[in-house]
Amino acid sequence: MNFKLKNLRLSRLNQEKSSSVTSFFFIQELFVLVKRLFIQLKRRPITLISGILQPLLWLILFGALFQKAPFRISNLENNYLQFFYPGILVFTAFAGSLNSSLPLIFDREFGFLNRLLVAPLNSRFSILFSSAFFISVLSFIQVFFIMLFGVFLGIQLPPFKSLIVSFFFLFLLIIGITTFSILLALLLPTHIELIAVIFVLNLPLLFSSTALAPLDFMPSWLQIISCLNPLTYTIEPIRFLYSHSSWLFSSSLFELSFFSINIGQSLIILIIFDLVGFLLFKKILKSIFI
């Protein structure tokens, strides 16, 4: 009896030790892969700069072009810039996430990805998590600069609690789009096809969301498409948080004849979107490389 108890304790100790060693190696892999991506960014800072300049141009040009458009959000009547600004924040994070697979597909074309896949990695998911972490940091840096410019234009920041929740919505979108972008890099043969798909998806996803116009201004068929767009479930909560000093997760974001949504439901939809992307990534990674 004592012998069995002793073996059981030794088995548990070995499992705990193995788990801690596994976690250590995973973090080490993650650190090295993320460090490599930041070294690439340091050598090619145009990625960071262009990710800031493009949304700024959209904010300045579209904000001026539709400044007198009769949109109304909360008590902010006829202020298109205030309406458009959350859409630009989301577009900044979305564009960076959509382009996140470009370094990976170049790694594959130059043979570096094959070296990673045959290396004794603790987990191949470190490839996904390193890209997601890097893109999250890069996107939040870009969003931070857009926020500073928005303050310069007279757009007030929301309360700290609302700001944290806004960042969390952006983080969920970044994770989901990054996952699907990396899936494209694994499935498409070369960077030419990937860039073509990115160009095809970029603007249609933006225009079919509520970034440029509210749902009330859209025809019925476009409202349905917009309700299927993950950007909408990031833009609408952030827009609400920017225009309301007090809110609840049950606060309604929009109501249509066939659909209504609140902040909490938007959060759940984005979490499901991320989980679906992660499960697809896991399945495709195994089918391709195992």
Swiss-Prot record:
GO terms for cellular component: ATP-binding cassette (ABC) transporter complex; cyanelle membrane. Coiled coil: none annotated. It comes from the Eukaryota. Keywords: Cyanelle, Membrane, Plastid, Transmembrane, Transmembrane helix, Transport. Belongs to the ABC-2 integral membrane protein family. It is a multi-pass membrane protein. This is Putative transport permease ycf38. It holds the Pfam family ABC2_membrane. InterPro entries: ABC2_TM, ABC2_TM_bact-type, ABC_2_transport, Nod_factor_ABC_transporter. The lineage of its organism: Eukaryota, Glaucocystophyceae, Cyanophoraceae, Cyanophora. One of its GO terms (molecular function) is ABC-type transporter activity. Residues 46-284 form the ABC transmembrane type-2 domain. It is found in: Plastid, Cyanelle membrane. The chain crosses the membrane at residues 21-41, 46-66, 86-106, 133-153, 167-187, 194-213, 261-281.
